[in-house]
């Protein structure tokens, strides 16, 4: 039994002293629970745990069985993923490379691409967010919890409990080390993925329900929007509020940063959206035109600019305004007036109004290739819009109740270097990685749906 003794293990042990102590206690708990009295006594003596008394409420209680079960689950998941990878490799090998690349880049959800319906929340699911690296997704719910799932397998992973009222939004940082959540309980919580998803920070300062929360690119700051009519910017490392943005006359439904972190776009019950300068905290432009509450506002990705310029009959070679960053030129908004609007965030002009939904528009997401806009609505559908023409190209009956949110996967997939052709030089550049093809939608029907090719 000497191998159990923390003092006799090699000096380069991968376990810290705290981890060794926890391991010893969990093994002792297992021995005691299973009446292995001799082994219990030997380990207690050799591991210097003479005062150990089993406690069913302690962290180590039942830990050995939990870890063992987790290992089995992980092994099963690895086998499933290896099988899936093998299947995909066979499919890829059978497809011509040019056609394969085009089809992957142009994929869009269809009714037939609903892969998983994940159930577990007890009240409506409000928002979903993808992990930036792994096949994990977080869901926020009115049942006061955040749940984590594996979207590849559809398996539930864990529940994050701590909020006392409805959780309104959820987000990952750029590396997937932290999860953010915000709630009607007036708080924002930070959960540490590397520390068993412990709630390591709770940010308080809003005077009413917190409806939106996001990491700013770079992960040094957090932005939140609230029913108290304000937007707040928080320093992540300290949890201090560094700036409060005021201007909306009513509930601020969301505040989303541009990819370069220079701008925010917010939307409100006051029927407007606003673009803000993050550094100064000033409103850059107010977007007026909707006839009801604006539920969602997002920046268009640079990849969509050419299509939007064509949609609005703008000069494709027109130089952008010097005050506009490359990442904040166009905005899409969705409203309870059942319409989606595309805006020029420099002039504040509405470039196009997309009509087709039969109820409130609740969520928007651009396709990575910039050719399409996806929307979800209280009419229970997901709609796909061609950005060059403004036409609805597909309507999918997505849920059995109001659809509340939509997200496109964040993870990147490295593209293979194409084989050399005659006369080509060796060592050609690695093609740009593409965003994984997966979409998630959330609903009042208590489910999260995963859509994949």
Curated annotation (Swiss-Prot):
GO cellular component: cytoplasmic microtubule; kinetochore; microtubule associated complex; nuclear envelope; spindle pole
Organism superkingdom: Eukaryota
Primary localisation category: cytoplasm
UniProt xrefs under PROSITE patterns: LISH, WD_REPEATS_1, WD_REPEATS_2, WD_REPEATS_REGION
Keywords: Cell cycle, Cell division, Coiled coil, Cytoplasm, Cytoskeleton, Microtubule, Mitosis, Repeat, Transport, WD repeat
GO BP terms in the entry: cell division; establishment of mitotic spindle orientation; microtubule organizing center organization; microtubule sliding; nuclear migration; vesicle transport along microtubule
Coiled coil spans: 69-96
WD repeats (start-end): 120-161, 162-201, 205-244, 247-286, 314-355, 356-395, 413-452
InterPro entries to which the protein is assigned, alphabetical: Coatomer_complex_subunit, Dynein_regulator_LIS1, G-protein_beta_WD-40_rep, LIS1_N, LisH, PAC1-like_LisH-like_dom, WD40/YVTN_repeat-like_dom_sf, WD40_repeat_CS
Pfam families: LisH_PAC1 (PF24951), WD40 (PF00400)
Subcellular compartments: Cytoplasm, Cytoskeleton; Cytoplasm, Cytoskeleton, Spindle pole
Domain LisH: 19-51
One Gene Ontology term of the molecular function aspect: dynein complex binding
Oligomer and partners: Self-associates. Interacts with NDL1 and dynein.
Role: Positively regulates the activity of the minus-end directed microtubule motor protein dynein. May enhance dynein-mediated microtubule sliding by targeting dynein to the microtubule plus end. Required for nuclear migration during vegetative growth as well as development. Required for localization of dynein to the mitotic spindle poles. Recruits additional proteins to the dynein complex at SPBs. Required for retrograde early endosome (EE) transport from the hyphal tip.
Domain-related comment: Dimerization mediated by the LisH domain may be required to activate dynein.
Similarity-based family: Belongs to the WD repeat LIS1/nudF family.
Protein name: Nuclear distribution protein PAC1
């Amino acid at each position: 039994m000497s191998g159990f003794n923390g003092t006799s293990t090699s000096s380069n042990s991968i376990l810290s002293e705290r981890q060794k102590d926890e391991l010893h206690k969990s093994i002792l708990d297992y021995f005691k629970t299973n009446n292995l009295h001799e082994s219990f006594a030997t380990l207690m003596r050799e591991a210097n745990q003479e005062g150990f008394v089993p406690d069913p409420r302690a962290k180590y209680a039942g830990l050995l069985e939990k870890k063992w079960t987790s290992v089995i689950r992980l092994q099963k998941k690895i086998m499933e993923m290896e099988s899936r990878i093998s299947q995909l490799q066979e499919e890829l090998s059978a497809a011509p490379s040019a056609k394969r690349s085009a089809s992957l880049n142009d994929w869009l959800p269809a009714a037939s691409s609903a892969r998983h319906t994940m159930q577990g929340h007890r009240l409506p699911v409000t928002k979903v967010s993808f992990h930036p690296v792994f096949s994990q997704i977080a869901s926020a719910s009115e049942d006061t919890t955040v749940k984590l799932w594996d979207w590849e397998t559809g398996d539930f992973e864990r529940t994050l409990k701590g909020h006392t009222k409805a959780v309104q939004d959820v987000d990952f940082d750029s590396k997937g080390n932290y999860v953010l959540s915000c709630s009607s309980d007036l708080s924002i919580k930070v959960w540490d993925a590397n520390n068993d998803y412990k709630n390591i920070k709770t940010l308080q300062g809003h005077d009413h329900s917190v409806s939106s929360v996001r990491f700013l690119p770079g992960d040094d700051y957090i932005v939140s929007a609230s029913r108290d009519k304000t937007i707040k910017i928080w320093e992540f490392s300290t949890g201090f509020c560094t700036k409060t943005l005021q201007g909306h006359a009513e509930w601020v439904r969301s505040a989303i940063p541009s990819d370069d972190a220079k701008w925010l776009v917010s939307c409100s019950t006051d029927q407007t959206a606003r673009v803000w300068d993050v550094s100064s905290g000033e409103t850059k432009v107010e977007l007026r035109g909707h006839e009801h509450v604006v539920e969602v506002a997002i920046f268009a990705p640079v990849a969509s600019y050419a299509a939007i310029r064509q949609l609005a009959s703008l000069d494709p070679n027109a130089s952008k305004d010097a005050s506009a960053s490359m990442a904040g030129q166009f905005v899409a908004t969705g409203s309870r007036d059942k319409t989606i609007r595309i805006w020029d965030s420099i002039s504040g002009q509405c470039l196009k109004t997309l009509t087709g939904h039969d109820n409130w528009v609740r969520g928007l997401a651009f396709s990575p290739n910039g050719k399409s806009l996806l929307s979800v609505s209280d009419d229970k559908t997901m709609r796909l819009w061609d950005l060059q023409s403004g036409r609805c190209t597909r309507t999918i009956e997505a849920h059995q109740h109001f659809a509340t949110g939509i997200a496109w996967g964040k993870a990147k997939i490295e593209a293979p270097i194409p084989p050399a052709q005659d006369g080509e030089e060796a060592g050609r550049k690695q093609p740009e990685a593409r965003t994984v093809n997966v979409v998630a939608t959330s609903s009042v029907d208590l489910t999260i749906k995963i859509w994949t090719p």
